[in-house]
Design a protein with these regions (language model features):
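Charged linear interaction tracts used for macromolecular binding and regulation
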Residues: 75-209
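Long, polar/Ser/Thr-enriched low-complexity segments
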Residues: 1-115
Length: 209
């Protein structure tokens, strides 16, 4: 059943035949209703695809309390952050979703550019200390001198919260001290955020080697 909100001239909300109507921000959205299907009607590739999407969804839920979610909400605008996360990261998951390619995975996204020639590597053989360098391009586009360098750590298959390094884009380098145990560090994701945290960049992964 559909409801007319605001009288006969108002938007429709609900189900009209096989069409679902709803409001998203200032936009009125119409989409086809999904038809129920029996369990045995799915092909093998469809079953795998559903498992893959389910795994992406589970990964997204694991970031529920992680500050990095703010980057997806900011970039997605009116749409749910998960929709953009799924579109961006589906290719990083294996066919059945059981494996993740860390180099293809993105934990942060947004309009801010990453600086040119961003590099990061373990410093002095200690996997808990990294050195990052980049070129200062704060005179171009949205980039600003006070954009903050952020890091997420992958340790033993687990992802840390989004952490501040204390470094700014204008510094052109940073020494990053990671939490946790050295032997479990698989790599780090580096990204930038504006000073007021209203804009973020997509991140880049660096393996510990």
């Amino acid at each position: 059943m559909a409801i007319l909100k605001g009288g006969v001239d108002g938007p429709i909300s609900g189900l009209v035949g096989t069409v679902v109507c709803y409001k998203l921000g200032d936009n009125n959205i119409m989409r086809s209703r999904m038809r129920p299907r029996s369990k045995n009607s799915w092909s093998e590739s469809q079953v795998l695809h559903r498992k893959r999407i389910s795994c992406v969804g589970s990964f997204w839920k694991s970031l529920a309390k992680n500050p990095v979610r703010a980057s997806w909400r900011a970039a997605a605008g009116l749409w749910p952050g998960y929709s953009l996360f799924l579109k961006t990261n589906l290719a990083a998951f294996s066919a059945d979703g059981s494996q993740i390619d860390l180099e293809y995975l993105h934990l942060s996204t947004g309009r801010l550019p990453l600086p040119h020639q961003l590099t990061a590597s373990v410093s002095g053989g200690n996997h808990l200390v990294w050195k990052a360098t980049w070129l200062n391009d704060s005179d171009k586009g949205l980039a600003k001198l006070n954009d903050e360098l952020l890091v997420m750590v992958v340790q033993d298959g687990k992802f840390s919260p989004l952490l501040s390094t204390g470094a700014k884009r204008g510094d052109q380098w940073a020494s990053i001290q990671l939490p946790g145990e050295e032997r479990t560090v698989q790599g780090i994701y580096l990204s930038f955020a504006s000073g007021d945290k209203s804009s973020y960049s997509m991140d880049q992964f660096f393996a510990a080697g």
